[in-house]
């Protein structure tokens, strides 16, 4: 009787590289395969051109060497959602495992887009093709005679997020990275509380769960709260400003929809500008997830971004820009506007709205400090933290625990303090560290004491 957990990436760090593998007897299933958002900035536009070895060296992708002896035993890989810290390394790593890869439609379409870019730069001698399979929430897939996958819908800050469940002869293994409980989400899925409670009654062997915000003694607010914040701030800014620029996560389709809808009500034409805005926005439009107002434009190539901003600069009060660069990352649209590299001139009459939070890593904090300082020097009006998180707070985590009643818990997707904070919560709920709650770090494995 063997159930082993391999902590491949995301264990002991908050910024990405999320990748976990579970071995059940002689069969292995991989969960997620993400990149480090800040470490990948080292390569800027050349991420696709960089070799796996280079990316591992700077810790931009998971070091999956712990799985090398087990590649032939890998029977499936599952992608929980489409954030880059969960799918960004798929083109670099998963082709080596020669196994089917499952995800929801939005997730799979984004992986396909990344694969198309990867193929352009791949070594001709290397076969990087991956067998991708689209699933719907509630689907079940029998992957081997012993193992079955189930996909439970859950809310998060990106459409079409699921909690993958691996059903084994020893009980269910639930992978809850990432989630929040939001009953008012409009785009994407709502949590299936009924199925989660039912699963708890059937028997959950192991819960692998994110821990990013478990130290915060809150229930994470609904995205409906962010919609009201966006509406309130943009109406205020519209009265006081000529130009309005909003920067947010390109993958946060529901937030982009809310910003665009408010701009439309204010009589401002919408421009989405930036490479990742184009990637996520176009796929979301194709799948019917994003419905931009009439006349809205997406500019994602250097020449179209330049032309679009030039036009908006001449009639600032008629436009609202939704742009990349909320982390201050070099090469994104907002930092380039601030540095005068793009033809949109900021003045004291303009407003910049950050519908985002700063991802807690040293590089991001430094980049944001530089960006904020430059904006202040230009006299621009700034509105920060017009945002709610997509990650579970302490009380969301407590609810998940009480619904699932897992026998064992492994906190993931967090730095050491976050993992410890989850262990503290679990202790409150009657669990004990090193008996049924296990803190793991990258490159380690755990055999469950069955």
Regions found by a protein language model. Give the residues of each.
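Short beta->alpha junction loops
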Residues: 385-392
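Short, conserved loop/helix-junction motifs that constitute active-site signature segments
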Residues: 93-97, 200-202, 342-349, 402-404, ...
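Short helix-loop-beta junction
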Residues: 117-121, 372-381
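Proline-aspartate-enriched helix->loop->beta-strand connector
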Residues: 204-205, 397-414
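Hard-cation-handling environments
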Residues: 218-355, 360, 365, 369-371, ...
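Binuclear metal-dependent phosphoesterase catalytic core
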Residues: 15-18, 141, 438-450
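His/Asp/Glu-rich metal-coordinating catalytic cores
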Residues: 2-76, 85-265, 269-275, 279-304
């Amino acid at each position: 009787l063997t159930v082993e957990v391999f902590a491949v990436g995301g264990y002991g760090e908050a910024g990405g590289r999320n990748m976990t593998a579970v071995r059940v007897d002689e069969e292995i299933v991989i969960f997620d395969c993400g990149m480090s958002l800040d470490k990948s900035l080292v390569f800027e536009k050349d991420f696709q051109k960089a070799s796996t070895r280079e990316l591992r060296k700077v810790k931009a992708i998971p070091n999956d060497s712990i799985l090398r002896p087990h590649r032939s035993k890998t029977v499936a890989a599952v992608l929980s959602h489409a954030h880059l810290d969960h799918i960004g390394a798929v083109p670099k790593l998963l082709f080596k495992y020669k196994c089917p890869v499952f995800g929801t439609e939005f997730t799979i379409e984004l992986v396909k887009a990344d694969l198309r870019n990867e193929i352009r730069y791949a070594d001709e001698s290397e076969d990087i093709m991956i067998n991708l399979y689209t699933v719907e929430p509630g689907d079940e897939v029998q992957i081997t005679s012993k193992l079955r996958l189930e996909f439970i819908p859950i809310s998060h800050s990106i459409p079409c997020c699921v909690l993958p469940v691996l059903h084994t002869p020893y009980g269910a293994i639930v992978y809850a990275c990432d989630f929040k409980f939001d009953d008012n989400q409009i785009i994407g899925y709502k949590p299936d509380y009924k199925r989660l409670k039912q699963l708890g009654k059937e028997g959950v062997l192991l819960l692998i769960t994110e821990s990013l915000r478990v130290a915060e003694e809150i229930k994470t607010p609904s995205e409906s709260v962010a919609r009201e914040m966006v509406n309130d701030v943009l109406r205020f800014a519209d009265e006081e400003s000529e130009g309005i620029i909003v920067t947010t996560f390109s993958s946060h389709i529901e937030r982009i929809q809310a910003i665009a809808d408010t701009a439309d009500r204010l009589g401002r034409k919408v421009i989405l500008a930036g490479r990742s805005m184009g990637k996520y926005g176009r796929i979301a439009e194709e799948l019917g997830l994003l419905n931009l107002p009439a006349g809205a434009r997406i500019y994602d190539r250097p020449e179209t971004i330049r032309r679009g901003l030039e036009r908006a600069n001449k009639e600032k009060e008629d436009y609202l820009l939704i742009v990349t660069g909320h982390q201050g990352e070099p090469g994104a649209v907002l930092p380039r506007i601030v540095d005068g590299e793009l033809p949109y001139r900021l003045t004291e009459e303009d407003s910049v709205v950050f519908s985002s939070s700063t991802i807690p890593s040293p590089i991001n904090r430094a980049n944001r400090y530089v960006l904020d300082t430059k904006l202040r020097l230009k006299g621009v009006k700034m509105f920060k933290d017009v945002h709610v998180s997509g990650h579970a707070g302490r009380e969301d985590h407590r609810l998940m625990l009480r619904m699932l009643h897992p026998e064992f818990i492994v906190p993931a997707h967090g730095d050491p303090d976050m993992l410890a904070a989850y262990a503290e919560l679990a202790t409150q709920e009657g669990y004990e560290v090193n008996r049924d709650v296990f803190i793991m770090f990258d490159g380690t494995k755990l055999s469950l004491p069955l």
